[in-house]
């Protein structure tokens, strides 16, 4: 079966079919957790990419999409993000308190998010403002709820995957009353 093939191929999966039936499960290898890196120096290797901050207009922010604790890739298992203290909701936009003030918003307001890349309007409606200790001029939203804001032409050079960590957005009050 496929698990037999996996255990022949991937280190740490030895006796997978037996171990998977153990009460409480088992840990798969994780080089970061174990402090073991398969490099010449047996250390992690970091690189710094050239990055130029985009010039933002007065009302623009840089949005990044993130995953919640209860999520694996696009599979959402629940509405809680215990990492960030956000519960029972995913349509949130996390903002720095100074940006909230600058945009004349308050924690809990309902807003719409816009992207105008290439002259095309993209909108994600009805997001709840959450004050969060994020750098100024930045916003964080959950993936895939704001994928609509990522231009289809905005992709990484080599992998051609959507570039969803630097999306320029505008935030407008929705005037929706909860």
Predicted region positions:
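Long, low-complexity segments enriched in small/aliphatic residues
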Residues: 1-81
């Amino acid at each position: 079966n496929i698990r037999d093939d996996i255990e022949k191929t991937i280190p740490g999966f030895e006796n997978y079919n037996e171990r998977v039936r153990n009460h409480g499960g088992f840990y798969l290898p994780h080089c970061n957790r174990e402090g073991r890196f398969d490099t010449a120096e047996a250390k992690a290797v970091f690189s710094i990419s050239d990055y130029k901050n985009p010039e933002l207009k007065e009302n623009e922010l840089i949005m990044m999409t993130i995953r919640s604790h209860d999520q694996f890739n696009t599979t959402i298992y629940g509405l809680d993000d215990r990492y960030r203290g956000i519960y029972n909701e995913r349509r949130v936009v996390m903002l720095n308190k100074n940006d909230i003030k600058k945009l004349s918003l308050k924690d809990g307001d309902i807003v719409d998010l816009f992207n105008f890349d290439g002259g095309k309007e993209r909108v994600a409606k009805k997001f709840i403002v959450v004050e969060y200790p994020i750098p100024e001029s930045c916003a964080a939203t959950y993936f895939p709820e704001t994928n609509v804001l990522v231009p289809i032409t905005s992709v990484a050079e080599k992998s051609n995957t959507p570039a969803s960590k630097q999306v320029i957005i505008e935030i407008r009050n929705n005037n929706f009353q909860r």
